[in-house]
Each structure stands twice: as structure tokens, then as C-alpha cells.
Amino acid sequence: MLAKFGLCAVFLVLGTAATFDTDPEEASPRRARFSSNSPSDVARCLNGALAVGCGTFACLENSTCDTDGMHDICQLFFHTAATFNTQGKTFVKESLRCIANGVTSKVFQTIRRCGVFQRMISEVQEECYSRLDICGVARSNPEAIGEVVQVPAHFPNRYYSTLLQSLLACDEETVAVVRAGLVARLGPDMETLFQLLQNKHCPQGSNQGPNSAPAGWRWPMGSPPSFKIQPSMRGRDPTHLFARKRSVEALEREME
């Protein structure tokens, strides 16, 4: 999906949490400190969950497989559903049902390996968004989709990244809508980021690393930033850039 844009730097920022696969066996001791639901617990929960509402996605929370995130996205869609038009309301209901049914139907095939299970959820999510025309919904509901795409609270989330990537794979008009919404919330820093992402293409066979920058670009601090990869929402450094949860009002005050 990202090939359409040639977004080299997306692995530096947008994709760090979404595309970084930690080895399940290596990561399990660290996760055990804040996770309680084993894969079998998750499977049993999904098997008994209703396909409406956010119950299915609640089963994915607090899992040793680090599958948090879809429940927050589900709640965001439900909380903003009233601001969508008729097409948007249908999309909210059907996309959440589609993802819930897809995940539940494939859970027993993938639950044994955390990496496979995580990817399956993302693939189902992406397929449902595409099938139900998320691009058309975003074009006709720019304000509502902007409320859903709240970057500061959801950056370290692989399923938020799948949502954002699905929107960025749309036509230029829709991408412009999403971009404008993000820039309005995050200010000039996000504008600079988008310029880097959309102007720098990744040539095939390139040996450039994720910290490479376009010709002529100078990093503000003299060297590329180093981002700490934190796969889970829990146990994060509260002072970390992507861990800060700031409201829209706080952002607006900072931008004044």
C-alpha cells in the first residue's frame, strides 16, 4: 500500500509500532508484567463475543500477543458515528462488524503464533476498509474522519497505523483531507513530516536506511532522531514523544 506514495520515512514514524515484529518468545517475559490474557483466553473470549458493538475487540485487549488498539478505534468510530452522513454511519457499523467477524473466523488458525495473529487482524482490517470504501467515506465526511484519526493518542498502535495507511492509499483528494486534519491538530511539525513522506521516493534496491533524508534536507538537531520502539500501549515511558496524550484544546493553546 505504501508503495503508491514511496514513503521511505513511514517506517521511521508511522510504521514503527505497526510494522516492527518482536519475537514472541523473546518479548513474552517483558509483556508478562502488564499482560494477563493468554492466546487461549483470547480465543475463548472471541468465540463467545457478539459481532456487534466493541465486545469482540475488547477480547483483544490486555493480551500476551500485544493486540491492543482495535477496541480504542471501535470506540472512536462509535463516539463519532452521529457526525457521519448516512454512508458514513453504514460504514461504521459494517466495517466494525466485518472486522469482528473476520477476526473471529480466523482466530483458531492463527492464534498459536502471535506475529501471525497480529498480521491477520491488520489484514482483515485493511480488507474490510477497502471493501466498504473508506476513501469515499473520508471524502464525504472530512470532519468526522478527522475526529477518528487522532494521532497523539494512537501513534504507537499497529491497528491505528493500518487505518491511517488505508486512508493514505486513497486518491489525492482524500489524502489531502486526511493530511489537512492531521496538520490542523499537530501544527507545522506534521506538515514537515508529510513533505518528507510524500516527496521522498524509495528507489528499488536502495540501501538507504530509515533515517535517510531527501537531498538538501538538514535535520533540526544535526542528526536523524532516534525513536524508541514501544510495541504496546502499556508500560510506555510517559515522557516519550508518542506517549503523550494531548487533547485538541491543549494543542490549540500551544499553537496560538
UniProtKB/Swiss-Prot annotation:
Q: Which Gene Ontology BP terms does the record give? A: calcium ion homeostasis; calcium ion transport; intracellular calcium ion homeostasis; response to calcium ion; response to peptide hormone
By its UniProt entry, which InterPro entries does this protein fall under? Answer: Stanniocalcin
Q: Pro-segment residues? A: 19-33
Q: Which GO terms describe its cellular component?
A: extracellular space; multivesicular body; nucleus; yolk plasma
Q: Which residues are connected by disulfide bridges in this protein?
A: none
Question: Where in the cell?
Answer: Secreted
Annotated spans, Disordered: 204-241
Please list the GO terms describing molecular function: hormone activity
Residues modified by carbohydrate are: N62
**Where expressed (tissue)?**
Produced and secreted by the corpuscles of Stannius.
**What are the boundaries of the signal sequence?**
1-18
In the record, the note on similarity to other proteins reads: Belongs to the stanniocalcin family.
PANTHER family to which the protein is assigned, alphabetical: STANNIOCALCIN
- What is the role of this chain? Its primary function is the prevention of hypercalcemia. Upon release into the circulation, it lowers calcium transport by the gills, thereby reducing its rate of influx from the environment into the extracellular compartment. STC also stimulates phosphate reabsorption by renal proximal tubules. The consequence of this action is increased levels of plasma phosphate, which combines with excess calcium and promotes its disposal into bone and scales.
Q: Subunit details for this protein?
A: Homodimer; disulfide-linked.
This one is known as Stanniocalcin
Native organism: Oncorhynchus mykiss (Rainbow trout)
